[in-house]
Amino acid sequence: MKLVHMASGLAVAIALAACADKSADIQTPAPAANTSISATQQPAIQQPNVSGTVWIRQKVALPPDAVLTVTLSDASLADAPSKVLAQKAVRTEGKQSPFSFVLSFNPADVQPNARILLSAAITVNDKLVFITDTVQPVINQGGTKADLTLVPVQQTAVPVQASGGATTTVPSTSPTQVNPSSAVPAPTQY
């Protein structure tokens, strides 16, 4: 009986020795000198987002102070202004189309039957020059990736205000709510 115990102990010892030999080949990275993970740190939680690319239909050179605004809005109510769920505005800094974007949103703001739209616009010197002219449903009806194509805004004569400047406004019911270029700090990465 003692012989059986000794033989099985020897077999286990040989098996463990063989396993230990194999694991010696696996290299583990050494921790950096100044990094430490505390028990209170948690990994970053990634919020849901909508991403895509903004294209301009015509070949045009945008000036460095052009501002691209991408907006995610809830246009569920026909007789009310759309509710902006997420918006990002950045100076193009001389970069040209296409522009990639990622808009994070709060999923609690999106109702299952909501009409969620994605739109974009470009302003130059506080004047609207390019907009999306088609409805781009996302999230509930269209997924979370969408490409947008911008078209030129038709220029029309506008009455001059007493202050001497013309105004270009976006109706409050439009899903594209833009920020004036003077309100967007520069430089910013998109």
From Swiss-Prot:
Presence of keyword Membrane: yes
Signal peptide: 1-18
Localization (cell): Cell membrane
PROSITE patterns with a match to the protein in the record: PROKAR_LIPOPROTEIN (PS51257)
InterPro entries assigned: Lipoprotein_YbaY-like, Pilotin
Residue stretches of biased makeup (Low complexity): 162-182
Parts of the chain that traverse the membrane: none
Main location: membrane
Entry keywords, A to Z: Cell membrane, Lipoprotein, Membrane, Palmitate, Signal
Span list, region Disordered: 162-190
Pfam families: YscW (PF09619)
Lipidation sites (S-diacylglycerol cysteine): C19
Membrane-related topology note: Lipid-anchor
Residues where lipid is bound covalently (N-palmitoyl cysteine): C19
GO CC annotation terms, alphabetical: plasma membrane
PANTHER family per the UniProt record, alphabetical: GLYCOPROTEIN/POLYSACCHARIDE METABOLISM (PTHR38013), GLYCOPROTEIN_POLYSACCHARIDE METABOLISM (PTHR38013:SF1)
Protein's name according to its UniProt entry: Uncharacterized lipoprotein YbaY
Organism field: Escherichia coli (strain K12)
Organismal lineage: Bacteria, Pseudomonadati, Pseudomonadota, Gammaproteobacteria, Enterobacterales
